[in-house]
Curated annotation (Swiss-Prot):
The lineage of its organism: Eukaryota, Fungi, Dikarya, Ascomycota, Saccharomycotina. One of its GO terms (cellular component) is proteasome complex. It comes from Candida glabrata (strain ATCC 2001 / BCRC 20586 / JCM 3761 / NBRC 0622 / NRRL Y-65 / CBS 138). One of its GO terms (molecular function) is cysteine-type deubiquitinase activity. This is Ubiquitin carboxyl-terminal hydrolase 4. CDD domains: Peptidase_C19R (cd02674). Residues 387-402 have a biased composition (Polar residues). Its EC number is 3.4.19.12. Residues 358-465, 484-505 are annotated as: Disordered. Gene3D superfamilies: Cysteine proteinases (3.90.70.10), Rhodanese-like domain (3.40.250.10). Residues 525-885 form the USP domain. Ubiquitin thioesterase that acts at the late endosome/prevacuolar compartment to recover ubiquitin from ubiquitinated membrane proteins en route to the vacuole. Also removes ubiquitin from soluble proteins targeted to proteasomes. Is essential to maintain a normal level of free ubiquitin. Required for promoting coordination of DNA replication and avoids DNA overreplication. Its main location: cytoplasm. SMART domains: RHOD (SM00450). It is found in: Cytoplasm; Late endosome membrane.
Length: 887
């Protein structure tokens, strides 16, 4: 009967468990909530629910498993919104005021949104259909597995022989192992036998972190008391521990989240993964997570004297061989699998979905706010509380929230061929060397038109002569089966045309400036501090001094290149709001010129857009300006990435890698850059991204292994002492490092770990170089020494210039230089400064506004010319901005 609670049947058991997941999401947050934040969460989640319903409608219903997973995901989204609307919001203190006669205009608008959502939930007829599908699917599963379950019960009753010798505890040996482990540095590897010793004597003091997909973790993992799973695809190397906790852990069970929150209380944290995974992605992510815990634990710092962070250097197979126990598959994982890797998981996850679809497309009829169509728009007032679990993109390797699998290391599996175009057809000719130092970053063999700044003083180089190649299947071993239509047309490849001289579209909601208009790129406007947002303000002032970038956003050209199919993009949310903030500042400066009253510009709407993509920026807490800078550049890149929907590149076969190692760094890095452009191709890449090589070398046989990493911000170490020069930091960055015994490289030639070295070399220098001075050590102590940085910086000696003329098979002409022609001289145009400690302090900036205005000091709303000639050379400098000069 209606209104009377019925006993839970087996058919409804799944719905109850799904509801409990929604309850955890809503009621497991101890942060004080306010009405606006909760409604924003409701609107975002309801949009996710609608997206799932559309997918269900378009799905082939013969694929019952996929349909069921989508229904479960939709059901959870619905229940989350239902809980907020019926159980949370009515009990907020602000709700009573907002529904009364003394409600403010803002509160009245929020209540309209509340009732709109309430009405939608009440009239929703799709949820009953979704519930029925979930129940029917469970019935089918139970029937299919009944016989299997019976056999499993019979097998489980059989007693297996026990090897008592294997489990006999040798206390002296174990204590010796533990003493050896305690002498290791954090970041070192341990063997299976050493981990077994720890678990026998120190299990309560041990936290294990499994860095594999949730499906693999549920199937089998190391059996111990305190263990959690952090999926390798759920984080990027640029994350902090707070982002891991607030974003990557969203789909994790409550007890795993609590264990991770207590991580600094454990004496040992051990990371492990599947070392036999072919792409090596899991291990690369394990190393990234290790670095995050050691170097970017800002929320809950890890004291190396109390907690050792180590990793298991053996495989799971060896763990079993050494007598280690494995915890097998849990049936509950079939019901509430919340993996965020692969396709069709239960939540799929909240973090990734909110990255991609947290905000609908910007309403193109309004420039005032960011509406959440078709619901009433949330007013653009300040948000200062609430950090409900939210997704993040990390956006690429932001570098890049949730990330896709990384760029596989260059070249095709089968042979050493330049797989430059990945899934595109091979070109019919190879351009010769490009002598233009600022040539745009276009993939080889495409007909991309360069995306050049209108202010670029250097004209495009004339089209170079073409060279026919008789052996041009080096592009890919699949080239002979590619559709020939692609060879005749490049229309499907990403296009970055030159900036037009007229407005890009008639119906654009944003005011745009044509390239023929005079743009005052030296505008000076203060930014309001929206509550510890100085870390945003200082970076915005410096970024907006990059003339090539701001012209593209001021004239609206950027909008033509937003790729809504980009896997890691925000579908234009970040780019549109970045452009709006820029135009607000530009117009404020213009009104100042004609005598109108002027003030500082608010960054609230822009900050809310950032928060919708990455929850790290959601509340009013202080953040690292470096993290924000990386997030912003990577976010803009993913929005504008013309190749953002392309599949990741294949990894090298051992034979191909060995062949690549025989090439010079100059040639090998250029090949890698061409491949990189097939998955990452945007104006941000063209303006800001560089590349460095990390080379391991065996000291016994001299074998090398080199990986190539793209960067938007180059982090250089600051040597200890009273003071140093910036070039000293680059010397430190590029010096050869002798690896410790426990860090030694497994040499493929020697077939064992050998004494080895590691060396970083800069292989590509960008047009605009952003340098981060690494002032914080692993213990979060700040190095405050004065780094003397010059106004003109020559980095030519640090650029790889080892070309010996040797090219890979099949290439008869030089690979395009892409602007990599020495010398590499840079002029300083911005400096973000930090005062205080990592946990508190203040950010300001110095920006060069051109010959007329000179250097300007910015401190939120306050700005002024520098008071003496070299005031901008500050002992507090933290992030430096340099622009390449060509004459």
């Amino acid at each position: 009967m209606p209104g009377i609670e019925q006993p839970v049947s087996r058919k409804n058991e799944t719905l109850v468990k799904l509801s409990s997941l929604a309850d955890e999401f809503v009621f497991n947050d101890e942060v004080q909530l306010n009405l606006q934040d909760v409604l924003q969460e409701c609107v975002d989640t309801y949009q996710n629910y609608q997206d799932e319903v559309k997918k269900i409608k378009n799905m082939d219903h013969t694929e019952s498993e996929k349909v069921s997973e989508l229904c479960k995901s939709a059901y959870i989204y619905y229940k989350i919104v239902h809980n907020f609307i019926t159980k949370v919001i009515p009990h907020l203190p602000e709700f009573e005021v907002a529904t009364g006669p003394k409600a403010s205009k803002l509160q009245a608008e929020l209540i309209k949104i509340y009732y709109s959502l309430f009405s939608r939930l009440e009239s929703d007829k799709k949820i009953s259909y979704i519930k029925n599908i979930i129940i029917k699917h469970m019935d089918t599963q139970e029937n299919n597995h009944s016989v299997e379950s019976h056999e499993q019960v019979k097998l489980s009753n059989k007693k297996l022989p026990v090897n008592r010798d294997a489990i006999e505890i040798d206390k002296d040996s174990i204590l010796q192992d533990i003493r050896y482990i305690n002498g290791k540095r954090s970041g070192s590897g341990i063997s299976c036998s050493e981990l077994l010793s720890l678990m026998k004597m120190k299990e309560d003091s041990l936290l294990l972190i499994d860095v594999r997909p949730k499906l693999e973790y549920d199937a089998h993992h190391i059996k111990t008391k305190n263990i959690i799973c952090i999926e390798p695809i759920s984080f990027k190397e640029s994350y902090s521990d707070q982002q891991i906790e607030k974003t990557s852990m969203i789909p994790s069970p409550k007890h795993e989240i609590q264990l991770f929150q207590r991580r600094s209380e454990f004496q040992y944290i051990i990371l492990y993964t599947d070392l036999e995974e072919k792409s090596n992605f899991y291990f690369q992510q394990l190393k990234s997570l290790l670095e995050i815990l050691l170097q970017r634990s800002f929320l809950r710092p890890i004291d190396d004297r109390k907690t050792k962070v180590l990793f298991l250097s053996d495989s799971l197979q060896n763990w079993i061989k050494n007598g280690g126990e494995i915890d097998k598959s849990q049936e509950v994982s079939k019901i509430r699998n919340r993996s965020i890797s692969g396709s069709g998981p239960l939540l799929n996850s909240l973090s990734e979905r909110k990255t991609i679809g947290a905000f609908p497309d910007i309403n193109r009829n309004s420039t005032k706010q960011m509406p959440i169509s078709p619901l009433p728009s949330l007013p653009g007032s300040e948000r200062t509380v609430a950090t409900p679990p939210n997704g993040s993109s990390t956006l690429g390797r932001i570098n890049s929230p949730v990330t896709h699998y990384p760029k596989a290391p260059l070249i095709n599996d089968s042979e050493f061929h330049l797989n430059i175009n990945n899934n595109h057809s091979p070109p019919t000719h190879l351009p010769s060397k490009d002598n233009n130092p600022l040539a745009s970053s276009m993939p080889i063999g495409s007909d991309h038109k360069p995306f050049m700044s209108p202010q670029n003083s250097l004209p495009l180089a004339p089209k170079p002569p073409t060279l026919e190649s008789k052996n041009y299947n080096f592009i890919s071993d699949r080239s002979n089966i590619i559709d020939q239509k692609q060879n005749r047309s490049r229309s499907l490849e990403p296009q970055l045309p030159p900036i037009p001289s007229t407005l890009i579209r008639k119906n654009s909601p944003e005011k745009t400036l044509s390239c023929n208009q005079m743009m005052d790129t030296s505008f000076t406007v203060g930014l309001e501090n929206m509550g510890n947002s100085c870390y945003i303000n200082c970076i915005i002032q410096c970024i907006f001094a990059t003339t090539e970038l701001i012209k593209i956003f001021l004239n609206g050209t950027y909008a033509k290149h937003i790729n809504k199919q980009s896997k890691l993009g925000s579908k234009g949310v970040l780019s549109h709001n970045f452009a709006k903030l820029l135009k607000d500042m530009y117009e404020e400066n213009s009104s100042k010129k004609i005598g109108k009253k002027h003030g500082a510009v608010k960054t609230l709407q822009f900050k809310m857009a950032c928060a919708s993509v990455n929850s790290l920026f959601k509340d009013a807490s202080q953040q690292d300006c470096l993290e924000f800078c990386q997030f912003l550049l990577d976010g803009l890149h993913e929005d504008l990435n013309q190749c953002g929907a392309n599949p990741p590149l294949k990894e090298l076969s051992p034979e191909a890698e060995k062949m690549r190692e025989n090439l010079s760094l100059r040639v090998a890095s250029s090949i890698e850059w061409e491949r990189y452009l097939t998955t990452d191709f945007s104006i941000i890449v063209d303006l800001f991204q560089g590349q460095y090589a990390s080379q391991l070398r065996c000291k016994v046989c001299n074998r090398t292994s080199t990986t190539y990493q793209a960067f938007s911000v180059l982090s250089v170490p600051v040597p200890s002492g009273k003071s140093c020069g910036l070039l000293d930091c680059f010397i430190e960055f590029t010096k050869t490092e002798n690896l410790e015994v426990d860090e030694q490289w497994f040499c493929p030639s020697c077939k064992k770990k050998q004494p080895s070295t590691k060396k970083l070399t800069i292989t590509r220098l960008p047009r605009n170089l952003i340098i981060h001075l690494k002032r914080f050590d692993n213990m979060m102590n700040k190095n405050n020494i004065f780094v003397r940085y010059p106004q003109i910086l020559d980095l030519t000696p640090f650029w790889a210039n080892d070309s010996d003329g040797k090219l890979p098979p099949g290439i008869t002409d030089e690979i395009p230089a892409r602007g990599q022609v020495p010398p590499f001289n840079y002029r300083l145009y911005g400096a973000a400064c930090h005062f205080g400690t990592l946990y508190g302090g203040h950010y300001t900036s110095y920006v060069d506004k051109g010959p007329e205005k000179g250097w300007i000091y910015f401190d939120d709303t306050v700005y002024r010319p520098v008071r003496f000639q070299n005031e901008f050379i500050s002992p507090s400098a933290y992030v430096l901005f340099y622009h390449r000069i060509t004459s």
